[in-house]
Amino acid sequence: MDRREHFYRKAVSHWIEINAKVLVVAGGSADYLVFKSLDFTNVTITNIDPRINKNDYYPFSYKFQDAENLTYENDSFDFVVVHAALHHCSSPHKALTEMYRVAEKGILVIESRDSFIMKLLVKLGYVVNYELRAVFDNKCLYGGVNDSEIPNFVYRWTENEVEKTINTFMPIGMHQFFYMYANDKDFNKLNISKLHKIILYFFKVIYRAFIFFFPRQQNLFSILVLKPDLSKQLHPWLKFYNGSIRLKKTYLVKKFE
């Protein structure tokens, strides 16, 4: 496993119980290896790649599913997981809310963080905004946006953006958000000149000290969103009435009159 996959494994083992019913969207071999290494048994891996052989994911289940338009009913799985794939969607926010919809307990996302350091590396030309290499490595036929031949824009997230997206999609309860951070960049493998590699080598010490004090400036983070227990975490201006959630008018009257 590489650095990113080790971080992925750490996040799964830390946040998801081994007997959970898990759906992985836009999944692949890395997801299979992580969940298999952790001895999970109830996992469904999905993707839209026509080349995938479902037998390669045994003993897990494999289904053809679009992350932006899942066919599952609400709350079909305990947790829904995505690893390094939301940025391949034409609408990452739609995929995120679809994950939320079909999860009963919560969602786990491992993606690139839109940090100051990453923005600086993009401007300096050390990190790309479009994934041309992914398409090249897939014979210029797959690996881009929606797994097409068109290279995707690398959509990077922030904590605030995740929280705004979830709270906008489901504004009825108090969600819980948890984060872990890591760095998966090996600057020695960057396609840059030897001089630039030497310069970056000396900056490594400074960078390590910097992220010690500012861990959120690393390029990678995992996001756990736990759905609210509406019997306890419903917003105070709402109430249950005849099996549905309604506005508690008395709350607004008391607040504004």
Regions found by a protein language model. Give the residues of each.
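Class I SAM-dependent methyltransferase SAM/SAH-binding core
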Residues: L23-N69
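Short conserved loop adjoining the S-adenosyl-L-methionine
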Residues: N69-N74, S90
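A conserved beta-strand element that flanks and buttresses the S-adenosyl-L-methionine
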Residues: V81
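A short glycine-rich, Lys/Arg-flanked "PGG" loop and its adjoining helix->strand segment in the class I
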Residues: H93-I107
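Conserved class I S-adenosyl-L-methionine
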Residues: K105-K139
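Short alpha-helix
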Residues: N146, I150-M180
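A C-terminal cap/extension of S-adenosyl-L-methionine-dependent methyltransferases
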Residues: G173-E257
